[in-house]
Amino acid sequence: MKRFMDEDFLLNNQTAKVLYEKYAKDMPIIDFHCHLNPKEIYENKKFRNITEVWLGGDHYKWRLMRANGIEEKYITGSADDYEKFLAWAKTIPMAIGNPIYHWTHLELKRYFGIDEILNEKSAPIIWEKANKVLEELGARDIILKSNVEVICTTDDPVDTLEYHLKLKDDKNFNVKVYPTFRPDKGVNIERETFIPWVEKLGEVYGKKIESYDEFLDALKSRAEFFHSVGCRASDHAIDNMVFAEASFDEVANIFKKALAGEKLTEIEVAKYKTYTLRFLGKVYSSLGWAMQLHINALRNNNTRMFNILGPDTGYDSINDGHIALALVKFLDSLEKENSLPKTILYSLNPKDNYVLATIMGSFQDGSIPGKMQLGAAWWFNDSKDGNLQQMKDLANLGLLSRFVGMVTDSRSFLSYARHEYFRRLLCKLIGEWVENGEYPYDLEALSRIVQGVCYYNAKEYFGF
């Protein structure tokens, strides 16, 4: 029997061990999509205890605690930090087969030097040991300990990017922290957040926005500002992919209706979103950015809890909407104008992997290797099986060797352990192919593939 999570964890063959130890393990990390707070990075935020750094904002863990029958008081409620930690320690032994079980113990090992298994019995000593380490370990220290080279946060176009600018000028921190342009509030015209957001956009643009023309000019201006601060990618939450052709004048009238507080029809919303996303796609192409589309999430399912806790608190799920036709029309509309940017496609529904991977193949070109990317296993798919399946699907239909690799997509500074988890799975998979006689044992070629997926592909793709 193998030891629990030893140095060969997940590396079930000799080739995998060689590839991981010699070529994957020590590669720097480019985390091109995450939700870390740049203010906390700049200030080297210190955490009062392991509960704050581990459980604060981590809806992955919250979902497991709820599934284990833990009262909300001990998850997001009024219980003290130690009580919340004990509730997590009570839950994690039940998580057999769940990636969070592995991530939890990788994080304990890598950041706190703790090899004990977390459970109710070990919780008091782990609490003491981890909190002792955290006295000297701030946000920057965790990042440096993780061998991170680039971090791309997720930012609203109305953000001032104050802390990105401060980090850019900070000579004592050599990790690059860049913004990512996420204009969802300006795309989702049907939501009540739209009008207040347009007002905020006007404030940072320096001019009250009263027309669609001015709105588009302001979006472009903000994209150019983001570019000057190092932004090289956008990100869009496309929960339902739509496509509906419309003229500029038609969409301008829809925009005016929305600003006047009038209710829009479903087709009007689709026309507005289509025109606005196409405009943004052209802007991204002109700037040389990558456009990330996160598709098929079903958010805020539990109305009662949404009203209490708000979004991003663990009440989302996979959607099963049809995406192929609208997505193809959208990409093709940009391609026809020679304005299709580099694009990374993620779907929360794993059934869409083959759909996305074959759509990608229709829009690859000679401008850059892997211009169209199948994004890493996202959110509910970020597991042992989910990562392996995503890589197998990509390999079956495209070039795994050109994959830009893993992202944390996380709000936790400790989540860089997931890059190790991913790299071990990558080496396991490639090692199995080699040992099954499906690819030659050519370390020159294999090392190039492994190091490309772990680091070089993303570095070249984004131009970091």
Swiss-Prot record:
Please name the Pfam families in this protein's record: UxaC
What taxonomic ancestry is recorded? Bacteria, Bacillati, Bacillota, Bacillota incertae sedis, Caldicellulosiruptorales
Q: Does the keyword Lyase apply?
A: no
Query: So what does this thing catalyse?
Result: D-glucuronate = D-fructuronate; aldehydo-D-galacturonate = keto-D-tagaturonate
Q: Its annotated pathway?
A: Carbohydrate metabolism; pentose and glucuronate interconversion
* Superkingdom of the organism of origin: Bacteria
Q: What family is this?
A: Belongs to the metallo-dependent hydrolases superfamily. Uronate isomerase family.
Q: Which Gene3D superfamilies match?
A: Metal-dependent hydrolases, uronate isomerase, domain 2, chain A
The record's listing under InterPro entries reads: Metal_Hydrolase, Uronate_isomerase
By what name is this protein known?
Uronate isomerase
HAMAP family, per the entry: UxaC
Q: Which molecular function terms from Gene Ontology are attached?
A: glucuronate isomerase activity
Q: Which organism is it from?
A: Caldicellulosiruptor saccharolyticus (strain ATCC 43494 / DSM 8903 / Tp8T 6331)
* Listed GO biological process terms: D-galacturonate catabolic process; D-glucuronate catabolic process
- Which key words tag this protein in UniProt? Isomerase
Keyword Isomerase found? yes
Task: Name the enzyme's class.
Answer: isomerase
The EC number(s) this enzyme carries: 5.3.1.12
